[in-house]
Amino acid sequence: MALSEAAVKVQAALQERGLETPMLPNVFTPEERKDKIEFHMKEILTLMSLDLSDDSLADTPRRIAKMYVDEIFSGLDYENFPKITVIDNKMGFDEMVRVQDISLTSTCEHHLVTIDGTATIAYIPRKKIIGLSKINRIVRFFSQRPQVQERLTQQVLVALQTLLETKDVAVKMDAVHYCVKSRGVMDSTSSTTTTALGGIFKSNPATRAEFLNQSK
């Protein structure tokens, strides 16, 4: 299936800036990927001395394969990039548009455990206005990959800048990393905040402060 125009533009913009997720060319169909993941997951679980003949575990390798391809890593495939509705700003709206408390669930690319948090996004319209739900969908698309939070924040920023044809975009993410919470240091209370600011949000102290102060 051919990629949408929006997907092509966003992917090219990320590659140009060195912000694309490290990926190899995709040479397998989704079903082929599921079959290969299932095969290797059986080996992994067996090496961990789990009995896959037990009815509770028998379908686990296939469940994991489907979850990886269709759900938590579906953002690795630009065929899954959301359909984007962008309209001309005929009304001349030039004040901040802000969407906050966007839920995000991603996966740490170092240990493949959960990143759970929220995003706040703002932009100042110039030529284009985007459908509000599309902002949430873009966050979800880039979250559905193995990620580091810093890159995820930047990817969402560049995607919106590209689609809206303006630098005036701001992204803030607050998340709990289960690679910190459930293993290693096992800190159950800390969270991580990242920001990516573009255009007037970066250059104008008052606009930056307005965004960050309202994001608390």
UniProtKB/Swiss-Prot annotation:
Annotated PROSITE patterns: GTP_CYCLOHYDROL_1_1 (PS00859), GTP_CYCLOHYDROL_1_2 (PS00860)
One cellular component term from this protein's GO annotations in UniProt: cytoplasm
InterPro entries associated with the record: GTP-CH-I_C/QueF, GTP-CH-I_N, GTP_CycHdrlase_I, GTP_CycHdrlase_I_CS, GTP_CycHdrlase_I_dom
Pfam family, one: GTP_cyclohydroI
Positions of Zn(2+) binding: C108, H111, C179
Family the entry assigns: Belongs to the GTP cyclohydrolase I family.
Pathway(s) this gene product operates in, as recorded in its UniProt entry: Cofactor biosynthesis; 7,8-dihydroneopterin triphosphate biosynthesis; 7,8-dihydroneopterin triphosphate from GTP: step 1/1
Biological process annotations from GO: one-carbon metabolic process; tetrahydrobiopterin biosynthetic process; tetrahydrofolate biosynthetic process
Catalytic activity from the UniProt record: GTP + H2O = 7,8-dihydroneopterin 3'-triphosphate + formate + H(+)
PANTHER family: GTP CYCLOHYDROLASE 1, GTP CYCLOHYDROLASE I
Domain of life: Bacteria
Keyword terms of this UniProt record: GTP-binding, Hydrolase, Metal-binding, Nucleotide-binding, One-carbon metabolism, Zinc
EC number assigned by the record: 3.5.4.16
Oligomer and partners: Toroid-shaped homodecamer, composed of two pentamers of five dimers.
GO molecular function terms attached to this record: GTP binding; GTP cyclohydrolase I activity; zinc ion binding
Full protein name: GTP cyclohydrolase 1
